[in-house]
């Protein structure tokens, strides 16, 4: 995660303006990982023998509702205005919204945790607090 781009970067302006809110019912899953943990996981993978695909994601995915509250708390902004689906569908197209914003991604880092990798950031709230208040 970085505020300079990607999923968080695209969301920052509305949240900073106090217009951030959960998408639809907020029940879809969001998998995330801090940049520090991503780099550490890649280094760990280079030093350890692991076979098969590896998911580099934090061990605790969150719902969009929790994600939204965590960003709002980190920025000290309200998150009471939900984003009605017609708005992003009009702006970005239905296919993009359905695939990128609404698809549930409850991905777990099974190979990393089974192999003994230790995450530094396991909960979204403190990770976003540190990231967005730097």
What are these regions (language model features)?
Residues 9-20, 28-62:
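Alpha-helical substrate-binding/gating segment
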Residues 41-42, 48-95, 129-134:
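Mid/C-terminal beta-alpha module of Rossmann-like enzyme folds, strongest
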Residues 12, 69, 109-111:
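Short glycine-/small-residue-rich flexible loop motifs, especially phosphate/cofactor-binding loops
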Residues 1-10:
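Flexible, glycine-rich beta-alpha linker
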Residues 2, 30-33, 62, 107, ...:
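Residue-level signal for the nucleotide or nucleotide-sugar donor/cofactor binding architecture
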Residues 99-134:
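C-terminal amphipathic/interface module of NAD(P)-dependent oxidoreductases
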Residues 10-32, 73-104:
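Alpha-helical membrane-targeting segments
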């Amino acid at each position: 995660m970085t505020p300079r781009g990607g999923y968080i970067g695209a969301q920052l302006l509305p949240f900073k303006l106090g217009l951030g809110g959960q998408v639809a019912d907020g029940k879809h899953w969001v998998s995330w990982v801090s940049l520090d943990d991503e780099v550490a996981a890649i280094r760990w993978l280079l030093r350890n023998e692991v076979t098969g695909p590896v998911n580099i994601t934090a061990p605790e995915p969150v719902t969009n509702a929790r994600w939204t509250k965590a960003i709002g708390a980190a920025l000290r902004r309200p998150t009471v205005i939900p984003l009605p689906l017609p708005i992003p569908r009009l702006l970005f197209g239905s296919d993009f919204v359905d695939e990128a914003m609404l698809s549930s991604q409850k991905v777990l880092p099974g190979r990393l945790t089974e192999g003994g990798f230790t995450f530094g950031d396991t909960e979204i709230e403190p990770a976003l607090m540190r990231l967005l208040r730097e």
